[in-house]
Design a protein with these regions (language model features):
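Cofactor-binding beta-sheet edge motifs in enzyme active sites
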Residues: 1-228
Length: 228
């Protein structure tokens, strides 16, 4: 079946997890570290095809600054076992930065408490309610991928055959998602897919902030998150 932003998901998880590690190794705030990397103009890097577009560092900074503001990033200390993680990504011509707040019990039970998403998808949003719904759906899909979705192969065949063993997020598991948009003077861009890639790395970065455990592979159902 269809999968939102399949290439960007893996790219974002690898790059945003590694950038988070660099920030902690440097003793820097992870969100400010990203802003510092984007402080200088970046040479346009585009390619061929309908999704190709130059990368705009100012727009990336804009969504990071907005998500810092709305999430209250760094404004108050969090108890051990609770953390906030951040990630951003550019895909389908859209820019999204997201903060995840999560808690992990000492025996490893994970609870995603809230997600804040800030997106720059151009100058005009025709249907704001539907745009917000698209982002909320992307975030829930991203959480499902991070928490328990995995494709395995046995003797040349996929083991998973339905949503019974490739689980989607259920209503009871749905997480509050707060959506904000940053307008820029460019034509409208992608929306349904670019909000998903930052979710898994932001969640794993939150887990590190909460427990000190660094997750470098998905899904999280394969990992022991217990801590002492």
């Amino acid at each position: 079946g269809y999968l939102r932003a399949p290439g960007s998901n893996g790219i974002a998880f690898a790059t945003q997890s590694f950038i988070d590690e660099l920030a902690h190794a440097a003793g820097k705030d992870p969100l400010q570290f990203r802003l510092d990397l984007l402080a200088q103009p970046i040479a346009e890097a585009g390619g061929a095809g309908p999704q190709a577009a130059p990368y705009d560092a100012a727009r990336a900074r804009g969504v990071l600054e907005r998500v810092r503001e709305v999430s209250g990033w760094g404004t108050k200390p969090l108890p051990r076992g609770t953390g906030m993680g951040v990630a951003f990504h550019f895909s389908h011509r859209g820019y999204f930065a997201e903060v995840v707040k999560a808690s992990v019990s000492r025996d490893g039970k994970l609870k995603v408490e809230k997600v804040w998403a800030a997106g720059d998808i151009g100058s005009e949003i025709i249907n704001p309610l539907n745009a917000e719904n698209q982002v909320q759906g992307s975030v829930q899909d991203g959480l499902a991928q991070a928490l328990g979705q995995e494709i395995t192969i046995d003797k040349g065949r996929t083991v998973q055959s339905s949503f019974a063993d490739f689980p989607l997020i259920r209503f009871a598991q749905a997480v509050p998602v707060e959506v904000h948009f940053v307008k820029s003077a460019v034509a409208p861009t992608g929306l349904g897919e670019p909000a998903l890639p930052p979710v898994p790395p932001a969640l794993c970065n939150a887990i590190f902030a909460a427990t000190g455990k660094r997750v470098r592979s998905l899904p999280l159902s394969n990992h022991d998150l217990s801590w002492s």
